[in-house]
Swiss-Prot record:
HIV-1 lineages are divided in three main groups, M (for Major), O (for Outlier), and N (for New, or Non-M, Non-O). The vast majority of strains found worldwide belong to the group M. Group O seems to be endemic to and largely confined to Cameroon and neighboring countries in West Central Africa, where these viruses represent a small minority of HIV-1 strains. The group N is represented by a limited number of isolates from Cameroonian persons. The group M is further subdivided in 9 clades or subtypes (A to D, F to H, J and K). Phosphorylated on several residues by host. These phosphorylations regulate VPR activity for the nuclear import of the HIV-1 pre-integration complex. It comes from the Viruses. The keyword Cell wall biogenesis/degradation does not apply. Homooligomer, may form homodimer. Interacts with p6-gag region of the Pr55 Gag precursor protein through a (Leu-X-X)4 motif near the C-terminus of the P6gag protein. Interacts with host UNG. May interact with host RAD23A/HHR23A. Interacts with host VPRBP/DCAF1, leading to hijack the CUL4A-RBX1-DDB1-DCAF1/VPRBP complex, mediating ubiquitination of host proteins such as TERT and ZGPAT and arrest of the cell cycle in G2 phase. The lineage of its organism: Viruses, Riboviria, Pararnavirae, Artverviricota, Revtraviricetes. One of its GO terms (biological process) is regulation of DNA-templated transcription. Pfam families: VPR (PF00522). This is Protein Vpr. One of its GO terms (cellular component) is virion component. Its main location: virion. The keyword Translocase does not apply. Residues 1-42 are annotated as: Homooligomerization. HAMAP family: HIV_VPR.
Length: 96
């Protein structure tokens, strides 16, 4: 009968420590790009929905990741990541 191999990898930090560190990084990045009132309202919504649980932590991590990804993809003024906006000719002569 087959058995799973023994865990031979490096010791990983506990999930809750990793999640809290990730949340802190996301929060510090989010306050540089979004109004604090928006972030406070988001935090209140998560707290009212999930309470003080790990499910709430996971939800806010997921939402902040999505918000930051979309923000950068659209073209954040603070970042070089995003869509490159090209000036278009008014008469369309730049098309081949």
């Amino acid at each position: 009968m087959e058995q799973a191999p023994a865990d031979q990898g490096p010791q990983r930090e506990p999930y809750n420590e990793w999640a809290l560190e990730l949340l802190e990084e996301l929060k510090s990045e989010a306050v540089r790009h979004f109004p604090r009132i928006w972030l406070h309202s988001l935090g209140q919504h998560i707290y009212e929905t999930y309470g003080d649980t790990w499910v709430g932590v996971e939800a806010i991590i997921r939402i902040l990741q999505q918000l930051l990804f979309i923000h950068f993809r659209i073209g954040c003024q603070h970042s070089r990541i995003g869509i490159i906006r090209q000036r278009r000719a008014r008469n369309g002569s730049s098309r081949s």
